[in-house]
Amino acid sequence: LKLYLNLSKSLNAKVKKLLRKTARKAEQEYLKYNDMYYFFLEDFSNDFYKILSSHYRSVITATSERLIKQRETKQEDEIDIIVATYIADVTANKVADISQTTRNQIKQAIKIGIADGLSIPEISKKIRTNRSFAPYGATMIARTETHSAMNYANYEISSQLGLNRPIKEWNSALDDRTREWHRTMNGTTVAREEMFKVMTPIAGGGFIERRMSYTGDMNGGALNVINCRCFTLYYDSEDEII
């Protein structure tokens, strides 16, 4: 938990700083052109990619080294492969998704501002204070990305630990913020290579089965990943929990 908190705190500060800078650039762009061409998003995407890539490397390395030390094995070379794979598979898509969300929210803010008869400076201010750049957004990103990267590292390095019959167990936070369907998953065990089957609520009622390799697995969708605090435990069927 301490490792998770320290790592997410570091990313939180960096993302908040980037969002403040990006908000100012977006405001200035609209003031300059009386329109929005989203030039600011190019700088944002490049900076965000660098921040996330560096963070993923730090998270996965720290998590993997801790697990390797606990098992008294030497798999340092594997860590570099795990890091490179995660950065390649996740970072670009994550940056693109958040950039597109930002574009859509600003476009909506401009549309509403024009409909309300606001002046260019007033709309520019609305852009700067748009929820895309809100501090809570940085906190959500920091928590979610740190959590997913840590769980990914645990999942990947668990295959290198020489376990005879590797088991994984879903471990939930179990407090008043825990999703009810994650509370139900608490203590669920499956073989490492199998998928957790998470019955996830859908709009309009009912549930859909989401298959996840580990807690925080992006395949579970936003409802299972954003701000999730569950962790996966890995151990041999005849071993103590690690």
Q: Predicted segment positions?
A:
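N-terminal leader/targeting and assembly helices and adjacent pre-domain segments
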Residues: 1-132, 233-242
